[in-house]
Structure formats: structure tokens, C-alpha cells
Amino acid sequence: MGKKHKKYRPEWRAVEGDYEDKPLEKPLKLVLKVGGSEVTELSGSGHDSSYYDDRSDHEWERHKEKKKKKKKKSEKEKYADDDERRRRKEEKKKKREREQSETASTAPVEPFTLPKPVEVVVEEKKRKRDKFESESEADEFHPAVKVEVEQPADRPVRACRTQQENEATPHQQLLEHFLRLLQRKDAHGFFAFPVTDAIAPGYSMIIKHPMDFSTMKDKIAANEYKTITEFKADFKLMCDNAMVYNRPETVYYKAAKKLLHTGFKMMSKQAAILGDDDIAPEEPVTEMMPIHTEYPKKSKKQPVKEPIISDMYELEGNACSLTDSTAEEHVLALVEHAADEARDRINRFMPNSKIGYLKKDTEGSLMYVVVNQDPEGEEEETHPVDLSSLANKLIPGLTSLGFKDDRRHKVTFLSSAYNTQTLQNNSIYPDLHPEEMDMLYSAYGDETGVQCALSLQEFVKGCGGFTKRLVDDLLDKMTAGDHSKAVVQIRQKRNLPIDEAKSSLCDMPGTDGGGMEAGSVLDFMSMKSYPDMSLDMLNTLGKCVKKEPEHEDGHQHFDDPTKLLQEFQDASVDRVGSRPSSNLSSLSNASERDQHHLGSSPHLGVGDQAEMVQDPYEFLQSPEPGSTANS
């Protein structure tokens, strides 16, 4: 390093020569404005009047001597001066930092500051450099110059943000971020504000649910978007409205389609995680040139003050030209949006549910894939499907899987010969056998139909044959002819005449006198199960009895009961006179006579025994066919 020389100042000679000639002058005031806020005032005309009042001639000579001595002394104390200068700079720096910290503590905290323009940054750097130079030369500055520095005015306090903005939830901040990105894509501001009929004629009649960026911003501030899917739905609605109102060849249609494509691609799950820079680079700005279109419709989001917008039209070839790759991405974005909407609907209507579908994996096993899985899950949620997931464990001692039938949908036989349903039917209809109940169920469908049919026939009982035929025709139409078929089958089983098939079930025998021929046989055993029809049976029987029997037939009618009574008396005497054995197993079997009169077989089944005891008039039998023919 070379020797440091002091700055050459020739003003000392000028002061010495012109001291007596120049009068005293008022110092000038120099004002420097930097950045519009700080003001530095320098006053001086090269000389100060107070300096010349106190200075004399001999002081100039004294000053020269001191200058020579100081030059020698400065060489010796060079390093000391450097240390002193360094120390003063550090003190000033600490003092400046302390003042800045005090002002920062008193000023309100600003959570967000905008970047300063380039011009302001250059001016601040220039101001700091000038200030540093003035401070470094403060000790060596000429004493004739008086420096007056005014304190800069305090910086105006910036209004703090509202409480609502400071208390925004992370969900709202994410939606605001998406909204800013979408508005940045809308370079011409087509979708910035709502559209009225003054801007677009007939817009309110065509579009029933309008949407724009300002409305979406208000909904974000009011926290009306509970999920990102709702935000996407409004964004899609806004673009769809523009494409519905405008023709496909207009710039607004193409801008809406392009914005819809880029917006869904930007708001996809991968873009939200990786960022826009990782998904796709910024698209180049399309070339703009004025063209004239045949349909000068106004924009969906066009301001009122713009009468002509032809200079903002794009070329049709460059506007929204979707290649195959971009078309696939657009479709993928729409599919993801639809999937998000479906997932939200499932979670809203069926919370905590697992809905999915079955598919086979590479190994051939069946898998259940869950559709509404946890959004935070990275992998697809699947569950293996096998017999263990569909059936319970084996019960000890059984070789088959336990299967529990659903009793709510259990189907049983309505009229089986060995179930409780048949017994119930027998208690309700004691005059019908299970086979006959099967016929009625097959004809009328169920128990309600059977009861309805019997109720109708009971209602018209005794009203004449015409009314009964009307009821039979009605039941035939209701059952498609099964009513008559069932009645005919029941008549055939009960050995009834075929001409009585159209009569009701409650009025089994016919009322017509011509229905009974002279040669027909009365089967009392088949009619014994109809106790409520005894009057009709007596009437029919009376018609046959009215005929006067011949003398021999009358004697035969009396001889047969007499013979039976005599046999009964003999059997009773034999039974009473015989001494029973002490051992019941040694009892003798019944004789042929006993078997002939008291029963056909000693070994009767349960059903046969019931038939034997159900009729108290067992011995009242119909006349023999031969005798009836003779009569």
C-alpha cells in the first residue's frame, strides 16, 4: 500500500488573497431530494462569515507549520488512525441498527410486502452510497462549509390487513391461489365480472346460472366452498356458460375451452403436489392480429366501455388447437373431476362406507377394489374375496358350512300336509281337506283370495241360480277360469254330479229338482262333512222319500235295522259274559263278526281312526244299490 496523502485544498490560498476584497455574503442553501422522502440541506457559498471574524493573519502561518508536523505524525500513527476510524464506523453502524430496531418495534408488523420496483432500488442504493461518502469525509470536510441536515420524515404507516384476511383458513388460501392462477390465464379479462343483458343481449334467458371470477372470489371470502370439487364445479359452469352462449367460431368460445382445459390440468392432483412448473412449461403467447368476424357478438365477460374488440381476436388456426396429447389430458382432467364429484356424493349420502367392484388380479384371484377410499392414501385399496369372507367357520361335528337363511324372505309351502299352515287352514275351513285346499290356493293365489271367493259365494247364498252364475262368472274372470276348474275337481272327488260344478263352495248340493235322477244313488258318507247344508240335504232327500216305496221294499227297510240290532245285542252279551284274562297280551283277536260290524281291520292308521270316529252316525248307511234299483 502506498502512502495516503491528504486531499489537496487550494481554497486556503483563495481565502488568503481575497479576504480583504470580498464582502461578507449570505450562504446559499442547497436542497437534495432522494426518493421523495428524505431531504438533505447543505448551506454554504465556499466561505462562512463567522470563520473570518475569528481568524487572524498569524493563524495562517501557524496552520502551515501544523500541517507539516501533522504529515510526519500521520505516518507514525497510521495504524492507530485506521483503528480509530474502524471503531467509529462500528459505533455508527450499531447506533443505526439500534434506531432501526426501535422504529420497527413501534411500527405495525406487515405480513406481506410487495417487491420494490427497480428504479426505487437504484435510488436507494445511490442514496446510501452518497450518505456513506458524506460520513467518511465528515472529519476532513472544510470547516467553512456549514452542513444542515434535516431528519427525514417518518414513513407513512401502511394500513394493516383486515381480520378476515389474516384469519383465512388453509383451504381458503388454496382456493385463492387457484383463483389467482386462473385469472392469470384469462389475459383479456373475459371472465372477470358478471355479464348483463346490456353486455350480451338475451344472456339471462339463455344462461340460468351465471358465474364469473368475482362471484367465485366472494364465495371464497364467505367460505362457501367446503371442498375443492365445488370450486371446480363453479369453474366448469363458468366455462360451459361461455361455450353455450357463444358460437364455436368466436374467440370467446375458444378462450373458454382453452381456459377449461388449462384450469383442470392445473388443479389436478399431480399439479397440486408437484407444482405448475413440473407439470408443463408456460405456454407461448399466441399471435394476435385484427380480423373481422361475421357474428359481432359481445363477450360473455366483456366490459361495457369496449365497443369494438376486433383487434383482440385470434387466428382460428392458433386458437385452442388441441392436439391428441392435449385432448387426452383434457379428458383425463374431466374424468378426475367427475370422480371427485362422485366421491363427495358417496361420502355425503353414505358416510363410512366401502363401495367398490370386483376384478381379477394378475394371479387370477378375485379382488374387491374400493372406489371411495381415503384421498390421502397413495395406493389402491383392495381386499381379497374368498370363502372365508363369505361364510362362517365350520362348526365342530359338521362337515358343511353353516349358512343362515334370511327369515324375512323365507318361502314356505302354504298348504303342506304336515305343516302348521295346513292345521291352521283346517281350523278355519274344517270342511275342506288339504288336497282341496291346494286346489283353492292354486285357483285364488293365497289365503286372502280364498276367503274373498268364499265370502262372495256366502253372500249370494239363497239368491237364486242367476245370481250364483254371476258370481261364478266374476270369479272365473278374476282367476282366468281356474275357479270353475277347481269346483269341478272338488265335485269329482266328492262324487257329486257334474251339473252342480258351477254352484258355490258354500252351497255344495244343487237346488234343482231335475238334477237328481231316479236312478242316482245318495252318497250320505260323502255329504257328511257339510253339517251346515243339512237343510238342503233334507230337501233333496225328501224328494226321494215322497215316492211311495213298494211293500217288499218297506219290509226290507225295516228288516235290515232289526237284523243289525239283533247282532249288536248278541255281541254285547258275548262280550259281557266272557271273563278277561289277567295277561293283556293273551287276549284273543276279534272275531270275523266283530270285524265286520265294528271295523274293517284291527290295525288302523292314525288317519283311518280319525275317519272312523269323526262321524257319530256311522251305522246309518245308504240303501243298497240293488234295492234302490228295484224300487
From Swiss-Prot:
Low complexity bias (residue ranges): 581-590
Residue ranges constituting the Bromo domain according to the UniProt record: 166-270
Lineage: superkingdom: Eukaryota
Protein encoded by which gene: brd9
Disulfide bonds: none
Annotated protein name in UniProt: Bromodomain-containing protein 9
One Pfam family of this chain: DUF3512
Stretches with biased composition (Basic residues): 64-73, 86-96
Region (Histone H4K5ac H4K8ac and histone H4K5bu H4K8bu binding): 244-246
Species name: Danio rerio
PROSITE patterns (UniProt xref): BROMODOMAIN_2
Subunit structure: Binds acetylated histones H3 and H4. Binds butyrylated histone H4.
